[in-house]
């Protein structure tokens, strides 16, 4: 039986709609974790404010020039802020991916699952998911920085890796290699969904500053929750598609 993207989209939409409250709670919990961790590890407001102070920054052209003209103390503050944002984002994404994939797995097996149970059930795979998401994010970002297209291609061919790691309990690099082979042979079914996910994430980044009117922390939680829901839709699609391909 041939698999069509339309049938998988419809299946994904029905599943997401039926389990929307659980998805929303997982997305919200992970957004809160991301924001709280980011706030806990970030420099203080006074230190952040100091990044824009000093005559040494006047006349800087571009981000690279700006960083070069910073004092060592300012560079340390910027590095700490970047590390806090990256680390908290990776933790939140790993928990969200694990929770969503375990929820889909359990619901597909006929079990009733709450958001907390799904996240709790994902605990054993979270360390591997964290490393996997770190590696794939690094590769995709490097590809996008080069010419954009390599980054998009990497995002497509590595998209099955989290599903394989959770569903088949593969190792990190085995999941990445298997994902490349499977996604490449099913490019017409995978590429549109991943490209749509990337476009949705990009649009959210463009509108994210508007959420700051709700206060920075609340705005960050709202933006992260929406971002998590977008990722949840893609994960459900990839899980359902992977299940159909294996049949």
Curated annotation (Swiss-Prot):
UniProt record similarity statement: Belongs to the UPF0259 family.
Alphabetically ordered keywords of this record: Cell inner membrane, Cell membrane, Membrane, Transmembrane, Transmembrane helix
Pfam assignment, any one: UPF0259
Organism taxonomic ancestry: Bacteria, Pseudomonadati, Pseudomonadota, Gammaproteobacteria, Enterobacterales
UniProt xrefs under InterPro entries: UPF0259
Listed transmembrane segments: 20-40, 87-107, 125-145, 146-166, 189-209, 218-238
Assigned GO CC terms: plasma membrane
Membrane association type: Multi-pass membrane protein
Protein name per its UniProtKB record: UPF0259 membrane protein Ent638_2284
Compartment(s) where it occurs, according to its Swiss-Prot or TrEMBL record: Cell inner membrane
